[in-house]
UniProtKB/Swiss-Prot annotation:
Its EC number is 7.1.2.2. This is ATP synthase subunit alpha. The record marks 373 as: Required for activity. It is a peripheral membrane protein. One of its GO terms (molecular function) is ATP binding. Gene3D superfamilies: 2.40.30.20, ATP synthase alpha/beta chain, C-terminal domain, P-loop containing nucleotide triphosphate hydrolases. It catalyses: ATP + H2O + 4 H(+)(in) = ADP + phosphate + 5 H(+)(out). Coiled coil: none annotated. InterPro entries: ATP_synth_asu-like_sf, ATP_synth_asu_C, ATP_synth_asu_C_sf, ATP_synth_F1_a_nt-bd_dom, ATP_synth_F1_asu, ATPase_a/bsu_AS, ATPase_F1/V1/A1_a/bsu_N, ATPase_F1/V1/A1_a/bsu_N_sf. F-type ATPases have 2 components, CF(1) - the catalytic core - and CF(0) - the membrane proton channel. CF(1) has five subunits: alpha(3), beta(3), gamma(1), delta(1), epsilon(1). CF(0) has three main subunits: a(1), b(2) and c(9-12). The alpha and beta chains form an alternating ring which encloses part of the gamma chain. CF(1) is attached to CF(0) by a central stalk formed by the gamma and epsilon chains, while a peripheral stalk is formed by the delta and b chains. Keywords: ATP synthesis, ATP-binding, Cell inner membrane, Cell membrane, CF(1), Hydrogen ion transport, Ion transport, Membrane, Nucleotide-binding, Translocase, Transport. It comes from Francisella tularensis subsp. tularensis (strain WY96-3418). The gene is atpA. One of its GO terms (cellular component) is plasma membrane.
Amino acid sequence: MQLSPSEISGLIKQRIEKFDNSVELKSEGTIVSVADGIVTIYGLNDVAAGEMIKLPGDVYGLALNLNTDSVGAVVLGDYEHIKEGDKAYCIGRILEVPVGEALLGRVVDALGNPIDGKGEVATDLTSPIEKIAPGVIWRKSVDQALQTGIKSIDSMVPIGRGQRELIIGDRQIGKTAIAVDTIINQKGTGVKCIYVAIGQKASTIANIVRQLEEHGAMEHTIIVAATASDSAALQYIAPYAGCSMGEYFRDRGQDALIVYDDLTKQAWAYRQISLLLRRPPGREAYPGDVFYLHSRLLERAARVNEEYVEKFTNGEVKGKTGSLTALPIIETQAGDISAFVPTNVISITDGQIFLETDLFNSGLRPAINPGNSVSRVGGAAQTKIIKKLGGGIRLALAQYRELEAFSQFASDLDEATRAQLNRGQRVTELLKQKQFSTLSVALMALSLYAADNGYLDNLEVSEVIPFESALHALAETKYSDVIAEINETGKYDADIADKLKIIVEDCKANQAW
């Protein structure tokens, strides 16, 4: 087939018109070393701190060390196929994770990929894992209670929405149990929960998922899991990923609760990464910025005002405040709260719940030490009725602890001292609470009223818990209207006091326990 000169010139013209002469700029580097999940890349001149780097085999790295002629990055995934001489590329994006309502009820890894076998997460929304915390002018004071349903916490160490309350103690003494109970107690309150598991066994995480499902709490919970078998890089970024998922709710005028279980393991992972990146070690071999590691994370938990929510949602949500409450967990070694990481986190948070091994072993569970535990801002948020009735409990316990030590050396005690010791023993017994048995505000108030007004003083210590169970059962069946009223209003006045008195005296008269 012969083409005429005009046809040939037409084809050439078409080709010239279709020719794409645009230049795609791509920052390319060469991997000069790879070991222990760390890659060193030469030639990436335009990379930013915290930027994602594309590595061979659809794996990404996170740029952490920016040197004069090289970049040190941690690999977010499998690195065994990466070798010296491979190419690496900047992609111009900071690490992001999926966020949104679709994550509720799911178990995801530190990058937001589902690991629960329930298919893909149906959300297109993403958020950077690192964000600047809201400034002072966007914050609102903490004045709404976050009920844990645990008597000793809600009465003595109250937590408010938007607070950071540290749970600290040795291993295996119930730190996670307190956090899980708090998540379960948010059922029906509208508070969304995020549980971040860092460096835990996969079987432990599976057990927590099962417990939450059994108590109907997975519907309002996201679980972010960086297991013990995951790399140090994933354990390091998991808390930030979980925090971004919680901020989605906070910034839209909702309330969220996030549990970091536990930040000690995150600090260990960060120490490992820093040492592999040849950063100079400091105290306990931690890098110099380990305080900033936790402060920039925990400062993102806040209560934000109406203006912040309205500005963030472009006017779609008006007149609503949002909050993100953080419950970081720190594991101590032999009760040493003066170690580096515990003291750092104590200084960052708004209070701490201190658990003691001796109390746990003596049968007091939750094993909370009321002397060392404090809530710096929760008092303003505490429910009025619990605040009124719980004040006497803390005083009774403090006096009891003081007298208990003294009474070991004294043979004969006066009547007043003996009465204080008796009440202290019964209050201590009353504060025992099994896991998964959280209480409503009204039932908690009923127990505190009975203790505060001396109704437990003439009971044997062994009768306190059975009496409390009978009291709650009676209140829920015969006096359900009073319980509903207290749960709804949370107020305490002479009328409510009279109603509580009638319930307690009715129970004592029946002796149904």
